[in-house]
Amino acid sequence: MTMDKKQAGARPSWETEVEILPIRSEQIDFGHPLHGTYITTGPRSQRGFRLSKFCMAFMSPETRAAFKADPERVMAEHGLSDYEKSLIREQNFNAMVRYGVNAFMIFKLANAFGVNQNQTGAKMRLQSFEEFMKTRNVKDAL
């Protein structure tokens, strides 16, 4: 398996890498992914597994209450790295996706901050909520 790794500025290499997999698909052009998308690969998923598992814990009302009371304690109990904790503190959902966190799990974490799916989408597209809702196929969304 060959990997084409590119670096951009001070960002970690894993944030910009495109991993070429030993499979062929007419639907996926691994050499030219769509701008702003990140191909979910085994290594990327493994890297984000701990943080995805942490987000999954937010299905429990007890975890949500404990996080609301003391987020640092809950993050420490789950053994998150300093970098993973910083992603959570900053609510940096795009970096979480690049890191390998499952997008559906990110919604569970965002909800703990009182951020709904549409607000999360707006944040990930770097748009205001109002701008984002205008792009949705919902009549009279705002």
Predicted regions and their residues:
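Charged, low-complexity intrinsically disordered segments
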Residues: 2-142
